[in-house]
């Protein structure tokens, strides 16, 4: 084929392999019915299969064993309908490796094939023996029809030659052998075979000798076949004898034919569910609880999903949900089938409506898959509501582990949000739990501000923010604890959803400003000159901190409140919190932390500092401030004079005068700051008050903390 045709081949393999191959070859008139030659006769078919049919070559063993299971299940159906009268005998599937011969053999005692069936199902690659069988036994066989055809040809990914030895269950059937070396040519001859069923013999090529190693085969069988409904035998059971392990006569069956999800929930105990979880994920903590899925319409789905205890070091790539099709392992990449917010769940989903060979684009577009995702969301919310209703105490005890699942679901799925409103919990700093409605009723009488907005106070660290929590509680307010990974986003969502409500962290402002009850004025307010002077005093005593900015403010808070309080701007802090867990917000993450250092002008110690500063510095500052006042008036006059004028219309003398005045003002302000800093440096009380505020916020560290302790001892 030309390069363009080969490219077309590769692109088609992404989605529905069987249908696409049919279309390509029908379009190019490559389908032929020539004896001794496969119906798809391109020389390139096998290289394409080897390279592109499956991303993982080890999938071949799943396909071959799955076909053996299908053949065995079909035999059981025929026996149940009376079409087979003979004894079924041993129905085990056997996998055997022969390193000397270089072969891997998968044998079954299923329905086998006649010469005509080999022609139809093996030689005509793009057709499936399941369709005809399904039509004939559609009332009974739907759940056991697998995918035949290209699945068999996956064996050529690891083999230089493949043989089929088969004898049909049909009376008088002749056993046949089919063989192919990976070219379009094949051979088929009559052979002697006494036992019904099929042997698939793979002559493993030199690049894939690993698939003859016992440990490698066992690993693959446990990965793909551990829950198949027909016993799969690989080797013999062993026992300890004469100082070593030796084989016994007992077959080693590697699979559990009736895993927990295939049984009725009424037949399972809690211990059964826990044991199955331990088998799936050895060595991790017991799950919080589980959900048993079972639906027949409009699609078939069974499974068990477990809610694990989430730890910071959990390996989400190791403990994934496993997807099965008729108990055959398909993948543990279940994006699109399981909603994103439930990807941290663990367990098993089994659905014959999801084919064995699926691509991500298929999962994203298939209507059944979308329905399955919606159904899982619904079942999870129903189960959570059920536990909440029946045992709220248990639900609250597990809330810290459940919280991340539920908040993520409410953030990402509108329908889940609607259902979860009834059982999502808010936890306060006293470790009490409330639903949204319960908490609203608790605080609406006391935490509604003058504008009618309900104010939800919250903390993110009970220890670090203790003084702020204590102040709020002393006013009769309740404070929520919102310290989860998703809480910044969850808070933002609740503010959008809940009417006339806002969330504020308890340290983001003074408590009387967080829940403002009225507009009040105070007699202790400072004038502009006092504010400028005291700003220099207090700012000079704030120790240098990396990526931190402080704005000094003066507020009358009451004589019994702290002399200085440090708060953090709510908006900027939220943006930085979200930047830590959300891409596209890196700009906010790089900004410095923004704090307000609020001096309580009602407190006696603050008033003492203000009065002492004015008294001690008055003689030095008065001439500077008087001169600065004159200079500022001159600057104001010159700026007014150049207003609405173009640059070339302003006299050069005025430009020079303005420049000189601005430089003079800068010089005078620097002198003022130096005087105030010198005074503050010599007045331990100023630095002590600042350090106390920093200490209460866990912001005093290293050398600054050591100096504070030494100064405290001296002052005592």
Identify the role of each PLM range.
Residues 2, 20, 24-211, 219, ...:
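GHKL (Bergerat-fold) ATPase N-terminal catalytic module, capturing the glycine-rich phosphate-binding loop
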Residues 15-16:
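Acidic/polar hotspots within intrinsically disordered regions
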Residues 144, 162-185, 205-209, 215-716:
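GHKL/Bergerat-fold ATPase module in large chromosome/replication-associated machines
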């Amino acid at each position: 084929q030309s390069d363009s045709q080969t490219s077309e081949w590769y692109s088609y393999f992404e989605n529905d392999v069987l249908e696409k191959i049919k279309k390509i070859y029908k379009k190019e008139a490559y389908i032929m019915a020539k004896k001794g030659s496969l119906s798809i006769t391109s020389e390139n078919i096998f290289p394409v299969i080897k390279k592109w049919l499956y991303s993982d070559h080890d999938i071949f063993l799943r396909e071959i064993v799955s076909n053996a299971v299908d053949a065995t299940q079909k035999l059981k159906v025929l026996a149940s309908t009376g079409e087979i009268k003979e004894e079924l005998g041993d129905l085990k599937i056997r996998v055997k490796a022969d390193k000397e011969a270089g072969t891997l053999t998968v044998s079954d005692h299923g329905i086998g094939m006649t010469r005509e069936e080999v022609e139809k199902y093996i030689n005509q690659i793009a057709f499936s023996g399941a369709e005809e069988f399904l039509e004939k036994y559609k009332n009974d066989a739907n759940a056991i029809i697998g995918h035949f055809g290209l699945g068999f040809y996956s064996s050529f990914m690891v083999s230089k030659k493949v043989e089929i030895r088969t004898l049909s269950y049909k009376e008088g059937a002749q056993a046949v052998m089919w063989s192919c070396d990976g070219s379009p040519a094949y051979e088929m001859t009559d052979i002697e075979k006494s036992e019904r069923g099929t042997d698939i013999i793979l002559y493993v090529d030199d690049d894939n000798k690993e698939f003859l190693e016992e440990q490698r085969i066992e690993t693959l069988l446990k990965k793909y076949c551990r829950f198949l409904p027909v016993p799969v035998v690989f080797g013999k059971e062993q026992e300890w004898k004469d100082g070593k392990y030796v084989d016994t006569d007992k077959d080693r069956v590697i699979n559990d034919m009736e895993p927990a999800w295939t049984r009725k929930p009424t037949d399972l105990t809690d211990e059964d569910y826990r044991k199955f979880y331990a088998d799936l994920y050895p060595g991790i903590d017991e799950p919080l609880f589980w959900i048993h899925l079972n639906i027949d319409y409009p699609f078939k789905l069974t499974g068990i999903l477990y809610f694990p205890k989430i730890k910071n070091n959990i390996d989400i790539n190791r403990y994934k949900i496993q997807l099965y099709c008729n108990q055959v392992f398909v993948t543990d990449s279940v994006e699109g089938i399981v909603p994103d917010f439930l990807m941290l769940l663990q367990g098993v989903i089994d659905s014959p409506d999801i084919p064995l060979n699926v691509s991500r684009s298929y999962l994203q577009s298939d209507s059944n898959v979308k329905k399955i995702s919606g159904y899982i969301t619904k079942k999870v919310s129903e189960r959570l509501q059920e536990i909440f209703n029946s045992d709220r105490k248990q639900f609250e005890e597990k809330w810290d582990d459940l919280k991340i699942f539920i908040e993520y679901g409410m953030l990402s799925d509108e329908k889940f949000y609607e259902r979860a409103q009834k059982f999502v919990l808010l936890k306060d700093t006293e470790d009490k739990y409330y639903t949204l409605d319960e908490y609203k009723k608790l605080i609406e009488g006391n935490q509604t501000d003058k504008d009618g907005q309900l104010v939800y106070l919250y903390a993110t660290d009970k220890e670090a923010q203790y003084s702020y929590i204590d102040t709020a509680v002393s006013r009769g307010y309740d404070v929520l604890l919102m310290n989860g990974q998703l809480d910044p986003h969850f808070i933002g969502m609740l503010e959008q959803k809940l009417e006339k409500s806002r969330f504020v962290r308890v340290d983001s402002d003074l408590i009387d400003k967080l829940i403002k009850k009225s507009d009040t004025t105070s007699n202790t307010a400072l004038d502009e000159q006092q504010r400028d002077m005291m700003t220099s005093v207090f700012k000079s005593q704030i120790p240098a901190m990396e990526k931190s900015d402080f704005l000094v403010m003066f507020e009358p808070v009451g004589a019994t409140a702290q002399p200085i309080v440090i708060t953090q701007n709510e908006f900027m802090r939220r943006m930085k919190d979200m930047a830590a867990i959300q891409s596209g917000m890196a700009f906010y993450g790089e900004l410095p932390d923004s704090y307000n250092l609020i001096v309580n002008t009602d407190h006696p110690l603050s008033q003492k500092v203000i009065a002492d500063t004015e008294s001690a510095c008055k003689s030095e500052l008065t001439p500077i401030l008087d001169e600065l006042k004159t200079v500022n008036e001159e600057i104001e006059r010159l700026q007014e004079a150049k207003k609405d004028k173009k640059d070339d219309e302003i006299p050069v003398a005025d430009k020079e005068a303005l420049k000189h005045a601005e430089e003079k003002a800068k010089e005078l302000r620097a002198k003022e700051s130096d005087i105030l800093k010198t005074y503050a440096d010599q007045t331990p009380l100023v630095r002590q008050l600042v350090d106390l505020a920093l200490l209460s916020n866990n912001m005093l560290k290293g050398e600054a903390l050591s100096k504070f302790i030494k100064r405290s001892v001296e002052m005592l």
